[in-house]
Design a protein with these regions (language model features):
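Active-site helical microenvironments for divalent-metal-assisted chemistry
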Residues: 1-169
Length: 171
């Protein structure tokens, strides 16, 4: 192999190692996963959740430059892999909507019902309190996680999938 080709191959390999492992982040990929799971998902509700989240996040982009909606889709895909229900998948698609857009929990409740609204609200509340003291923050995070689990463990599962996806993009 000529020296120039070796250098190019080495540069490409080094660049590839710096890139995060891509996850399928299209809604079509999520729908494929939903269908392939063989579970009885409420596609109408999940489609409506995607449409609301996609419209709400339409002008937002991640640091990578990809549309923001790719993150909620990836979180929803993780939940499908775990065998979670339609309400959890819909809530995952909208988990940042109330926090980062003008859409309110009341609007989500009107369009999707109390169960989905409670899940979205629970995930939102897990991230809202800010602390300057690390020990206080850790204690409060533990308290919030325990409270969320006592109300509906799905809130914690959605939040953990959210954190997992955020950590995967930095690998």
């Amino acid at each position: 192999m000529p020296e120039e080709a070796k250098k190019n191959a080495a540069e490409q390999a080094a660049q590839a190692q710096k890139q995060p492992v891509p996850m399928p982040t299209t809604y079509e990929a999520l729908r494929h996963d939903l269908i392939a799971s063989g579970r009885a998902y409420d596609f109408d509700m999940i489609d409506r959740a995607y449409q609301l989240a996609s419209a709400a996040h339409a002008t937002q982009f991640r640091r990578s430059g990809e549309p923001y909606i790719c993150h909620p889709i990836s979180v929803a895909q993780l939940l499908v892999e775990l065998g979670m229900d339609s309400e959890s998948v819909a809530a995952a698609l909208m988990h940042d909507v109330a926090e980062d857009t003008p859409v309110t929990i009341d609007e989500i409740r009107q369009k999707f019902g109390s169960e989905v609204a409670l899940l979205v609200d629970g995930v939102t509340k897990l991230t809202q309190i800010k602390f300057s003291n690390v020990e206080d923050r850790k204690a409060e995070n533990l308290r919030k996680m325990l409270l969320a689990m006592s109300q509906d463990v799905r809130v914690m599962i959605i939040k953990l999938c959210d954190r997992l996806h955020l950590s995967l993009i930095h690998i």
